[in-house]
């Protein structure tokens, strides 16, 4: 799946724990680009030195790719049965266990492979923090720090120009990242997918702030935020309404509505992939290491 902070820290912890416990009796195979590498047999024999100096590195030394779970049972353009190919390569490599790092789709595929008889240890990775079985996923806290820093920086220009600013935070279906960053950054309004918003309430809050002498407002908006009107539609119509939106994202629609209702200049900032890039923070380095050590012990 998508990259995030803490992947290399987790990989490092798995490897170093195995080397410390088993020494030369362990052989670690790196699967290139995630499930894609396991499907097409793209691997790399790893050495202890491959794991040095990567604790603080963002991204992943093994690469990654998106292999949607819903397509795992669908043969590819070359008629390759992906599940059977992964099982075949697992056995061909002589693996004792497959260690998987990923979010919802990755976890579903990991469980599918388990049901097919493979030994799998799967660790929770996502900046969305939306996986069952753990309070925190690695990558989440680092993304919170970055999104919070964006909100902090926007505050100064918002106050200087007397504008409304919308910071669009990653999160199509869940609002953990937006909620945490919004609270930490002191956002005046926070909109998340789980709670459909009422644009009239948003406008009322902004007007109330203006009447109270506040010439600016900061909104933290999840990319998956949705209005009450659209949320009330049947699923098929709801998807069509979102697809037909004339703006690049929901934040621009909200900005238009605010500007039209208040007359106050409204701007949108989209930090995008900045949120999942760069070095993991201290918390993610620790939790990634703990996850990796436990995976090796299992």
Model-derived features: positions:
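N-terminal phosphate-binding or glycine-rich loops at protein starts, especially the Walker A/P-loop
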Residues: 1-42
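Short glycine/serine/threonine-rich phosphate/pyrophosphate-binding segments
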Residues: 3-14, 38-39, 83-84, 97-111, ...
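C-terminal non-catalytic interaction/assembly regions of soluble proteins
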Residues: 246-298
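Short, ordered loop/turn segments at secondary-structure junctions
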Residues: 1-2, 31-36, 66-67, 103-106, ...
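A glycine- and small-aliphatic-rich helix-loop capping segment at beta-alpha/alpha-beta transitions
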Residues: 12-21, 44-50, 112-122, 138-142, ...
């Amino acid at each position: 799946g998508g990259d995030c902070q803490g992947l290399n820290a987790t990989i490092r912890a798995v490897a170093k724990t195995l080397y410390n416990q088993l020494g030369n009796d362990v052989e670690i195979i790196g699967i290139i680009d995630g499930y894609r590498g396991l499907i097409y047999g793209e691997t790399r024999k790893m050495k202890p030195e491959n794991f040095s100096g990567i604790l603080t590195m963002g991204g992943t030394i093994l690469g990654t790719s998106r292999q949607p779970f819903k397509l795992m049972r669908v043969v590819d353009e070359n008629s390759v049965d992906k599940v059977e190919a992964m099982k075949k390569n697992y056995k061909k490599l002589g693996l004792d266990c497959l260690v998987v790092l990923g979010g919802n789709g990755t976890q579903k595929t990991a469980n599918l492979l388990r049901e097919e008889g493979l030994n799998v240890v799967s660790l929770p990775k996502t900046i969305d923090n939306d996986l069952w079985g753990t309070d925190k996923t690695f990558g989440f806290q680092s993304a919170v720090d970055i999104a919070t820093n964006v909100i902090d920086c926007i505050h100064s220009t918002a106050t200087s120009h007397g504008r409304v600013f919308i910071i669009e935070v990653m999160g199509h279906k869940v609002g953990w990242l937006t909620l945490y960053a919004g609270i930490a950054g002191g956002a005046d309004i926070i909109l998340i997918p789980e709670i459909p918003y009422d644009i009239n309430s948003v406008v009322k809050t902004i007007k109330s702030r203006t009447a109270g002498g506040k010439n600016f407002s900061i909104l933290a908006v999840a990319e998956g935020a949705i209005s009450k009107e659209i949320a009330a539609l049947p699923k098929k119509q709801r998807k069509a309404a979102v697809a037909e939106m004339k703006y690049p994202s929901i934040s621009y629609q909200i900005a238009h509505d605010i500007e039209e209702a208040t007359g106050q200049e409204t701007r949108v900032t989209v930090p995008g992939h900045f949120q999942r890039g760069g070095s993991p923070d201290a918390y993610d380095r620790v939790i990634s290491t703990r996850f990796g050590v436990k995976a090796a012990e299992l």
